[in-house]
Amino acid sequence: MRMRKGRNTVLLLLSFLFSMAAVAQRHEILNENIRSLQVVANKDWLAMPIMELGNGVLDIHFDDLTHEYHRYSYKLEHCEADWKPTTSLFDSDYVEGFANGNTIDNVEQSLLTNTIYTHYHLSIPNEVCRPKISGNYLLTIYDDDGNDAIKVCFMVKEPFTQSMGIGLNVVTNTDATINTAHQQVEMELKYNSYNVTNPQTQIKTVLLQNKRWDNARWNAKPQYVMSDGLRWSHNANYIFWAGNEYRKFEILSTDVASTGIERIRWDGADFHAYPFIALPRLNYLYDEDANGAFLIRNSNNYNINTESDYMQVHFQLSCPQPVKGDVYVNGDWTYDRFLPQYKMAYDEESKSYQTVIPLKLGYYSYQYIVLNENGRTEIMPTEGSYYQTENTYQALVYYREQGGRTDKLVGYTSFKFKAR
């Protein structure tokens, strides 16, 4: 009975922790004409937007739904571990070149598409703007009138030889449930060459599941504090609902239905794509997915940025009755933002949640999420939560030296869990 009571206590704590809205900055689109924002480090579309200091490149792509040229500029700000702007540094302390007033000059118009758009591409670092130190960065893209259009968040980590060591492991025999619905992360941190005398103030940590910021775990207290590092074991803060495999579809042309698509039609004005109706998942069934990631591409895999059209994608989730809270489509391509354009409406006649989202041709993985009345995310009941679910966990470690002026990103690792 004592064990059951303990597990119930952990579940109550988990219910709160899982759904707490993260205070971190996330990519944000502020101009309604902007679509298909992609932020990719080192050409790895499955990874977080993190590059190594002095090595690697961050590519930012987006479309403006017009053929009119708009002059977009950008500014770069360094942020602390909690994503608040760093106030103790001058621009020259963190940027080589110029932190503000730089223009995006790589511009192309769409070709042979029903939806006309202008494609913009920016790479960081470049000839006029290069990050000089590690940490979090906020890049704001704005128009000629000074109105913010896009906010992009990315990270720069210390080189591998100057990083702390991070080890991750995942167990399904958790302090909440045993081989049922949860996964618990165990983490170990080695300081290596860093001088840490007060880890409570010098070390900050973030643990994410599938790159999601809405259920990220911030600065969990470690169970073990050692002279050379920290260890988190059986930590209630590191218990996650396992969820289920992400759903997915791929649209490579406006003519042929491909993976996950039941049919495509043209209504005289727009192309429409209909993913297969999402039925309730009563059991776990492995299905390889990309954990929310997306990739713009077309059937020719040629000029994908300017010759890929847009489709009106009709999402439909079968559900016997409405659930408490609002239901959203969620993936990397929604930027963990629960906005009206990703919200689903319940249709009594078909007993399903439905919404239509305009998307560019490509591969998309996604999940259905409930946002409760307190603004916290929950598992969609029809999707289920199974301990076998393949999830990827990411750990970020920040360090501030004694008397230091800012937080450095000194550790990052990613661990993919696969049930045996």
Q: Residue ranges of each PLM-predicted region?
A:
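Basic K/R-rich, polyanion-interacting modules in nucleoproteins and related proteins
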Residues: 273-323, 409-420
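Short acidic/polar inter-strand loop motif in beta-rich domains
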Residues: 81-83, 129, 143-149, 212-213, ...
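Short, compositionally biased P/S/T/A/G/V-rich stretches that sit at domain boundaries
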Residues: 25-52, 160-175, 289-302
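Aromatic-rich carbohydrate-binding modules that target alpha-glucans
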Residues: 96-120, 213-222, 312-361, 373-402
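Bacterial Sec-dependent N-terminal signal peptides
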Residues: 1-26
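Contiguous beta-strand segments within globular domains
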Residues: 35-80, 177-191, 302-315
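Low-complexity, Pro/Ser/Thr- and charge-rich linker/hinge segments at domain boundaries
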Residues: 28-31, 156-180, 387-411
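Ligand-binding face of N-terminal immunoglobulin V-set domains in extracellular IgSF glycoproteins
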Residues: 114-142
